[in-house]
C-alpha cells in the first residue's frame, strides 16, 4: 500500500514532468529523460517541501535553471 505522502509526491513529480514537457514542446518521455539527465528530478526530490508550494510556471522555471546549471540547453 502506498502512503498518502508518497502518492502526493509522485503525482506532483508527474505533473511537473508534464508541465515541463508542455513548456518545451516535448513528450513525457523526453521531458523525464531531460530532467533526469540534468538533475531536475534530483532537485524536485530534494526540494519538494518548498517547491510544491509554488505555481507550476515557477516550478518549470526553477527546473530550467537547475538543468541549465548542470549542462542542459533548454
Where are these regions (language model features)?
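N-terminal acidic leader/helix
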Residues: 1-28
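Arginine residue identity/basic-tract feature
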Residues: 4-9, 39, 68-69, 73
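Amphipathic, hydrophobic secondary-structure cores in small proteins
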Residues: 21-23, 27-52
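Long, compositionally biased
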Residues: 49-74
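N-terminal, charged low-complexity regulatory/assembly segments
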Residues: 12-16, 44, 63-66
